[in-house]
């Protein structure tokens, strides 16, 4: 029997980290064995993540999955110098541990997923040193609207830091992308835009790999019998529509369309509109309880804020999943970004 091919998956974010970037490797790596690949995940030590950890999410990772962790520079040391990005803080540790693994063991491919983006630069460096082909995986564009039309300034406008980040991405992305043997992305538009920005990139293969879904998450949720009835009341005869996720400035026009439709429904059938409740969770993408509301102010513009509730702080993953399970309907909103 042919031995499985081996892939080193580099993902700075991984459970118990609770950020959105943790799910790409979490969902992908456990299923690679079904397709003839034996994965090893290289990630960051939980002590070096910022924000709250999600131990329940960590419990959902299959025990058979090999996970190697390395230290990153502590944020308390680097932030006074303006560096908080996990990819930068962990770059040295990821390089050191990846080099150690590639020296001692055989790997047939390297899979680096971004965000954060800077670890993508490990691809060309490790390929040059060890001759291992690498795949660059995009969860989001490296060079997108951040620093161009949106940023960390007031009202979500671009500021100096977001513009600097975009400038760095425009200079660094070609170095990584041109060396990539394969390019994958959550959408075809994402990798096509990246290749369009870098005409000299000639990957041997490209593929669209949506974030996807794992039935095991629902089975895990049911086994734990988690309930969030205080967040989504049941048996009250109301129509509970839930949105769980970040609400970016580029998504506000979509939300305005939703609120305008709810306002119009109130004009046409006030009794039906009175039964509708829109619930928003995690809109700020921050863990802190003091994060500012983003959905309620928009609802107020259309006079439907009495039908809207919002919890800006992020929920733990399985809490958010239970909230979606408890909902009458789930609201999925995109943004104005073409990818």
Place the predicted regions along the sequence by residue.
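N-terminal subdomain of nucleotide-sugar transferases
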Residues: 1-66, 182, 265, 270
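A conserved catalytic-core segment of Leloir-type glycosyltransferases
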Residues: 2-3, 40-105
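Acceptor-binding helix/loop patch of EC 2.4 sugar-transfer enzymes
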Residues: 12, 72-84, 101-105, 129-170
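Donor nucleotide-sugar binding/catalytic pocket of nucleotide-sugar-dependent glycosyltransferases
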Residues: 43, 143, 163-235
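An aromatic- and histidine-rich active-site surface loop
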Residues: 83-94, 109-130, 136-146
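Acidic donor-binding loop of glycosyltransferase active sites
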Residues: 181, 307-310, 321-339
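Conserved donor-binding/catalytic core segment of Leloir-type glycosyltransferases
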Residues: 230-252, 259
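Nucleotide-activated donor-binding/catalytic signature segment of Leloir-type glycosyltransferases, i.e.
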Residues: 275-284, 290-314
